[in-house]
Amino acid sequence: MKRNILLITFCFLTALAFGQDKQLTILHTNDTHSQIYPLSPNLADTMKADRGGFVRRIAMLKEERAKNPDLLLFDSGDFSQGSPYYTMFKGDVEVGLMNQMHYDAATIGNHEFDFGLDNMVRLFKKANFPIVCANYDFKGTELAKLVKPYIILKRNGLKIGVFGLAPKLDGLVVKANYGPIVYNDPVVCAQKVINELKAKKCDLIICISHLGWNIEGVSDEEVIAGTRGLDLVLGGHSHTYLTKLEYVKDLDGKMVGEDQNGKHAIYVGKLVLDMKKKK
């Protein structure tokens, strides 16, 4: 099986609720864009040729979970749009396969709106994983009951807060497809959620973002630079291939890491966090 994991290991200092050091493994995808099968083996770009595909990812995840049952799996949005499967079945294939992968959470990309709100409601009800987005106001839609601003997960004795951020819809999505949904400032919303998660004594706070890296509009860099208390961003939207974590200084001067895996799930990001208790 061709491996499709980018592995990044880094040490993370935190005020752990327990005395001993901890380790946490995170796998993540973004902008898979309905890439059901591997890319063509005949592509000139050998870094992409014959990579990806849901069957491979499902098999790889089984292997990874056999080694580490406590791992976390996240998606940063735009699992929709990009193949005839999505055009014909409007997301049923993609969500069905994601269910087999047992995601812990996903956020919303702009292409999730491509068939309108009713289709999003149908798909999110089908998903066996939570959808998180903190900066959209879903008031007046059925999505208000289906999308949470954040979730709190527990792994290996750690309390992990996870929230989502999504891009401005105007100019990306036809107005009829998002209707009354209101986009709010991601920086303001992020800080509000971070404060709530800190108050709930989370050991680690992760943002799964579809804002984009080094992109026009509010980007992941701006969210990190304009907030305090965030620990890690798993990005999407800009289709950026990061071979190592990129760091941005937050309001307290702490360097916060960002990771992103390009598109089509050619790579699955793997982060191994060594959680060290602050002295």
Positions of predicted regions on the chain:
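Bacterial Sec-dependent N-terminal signal peptides
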Residues: 1-21
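Acidic, metal/ion-coordinating pockets
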Residues: 19-279
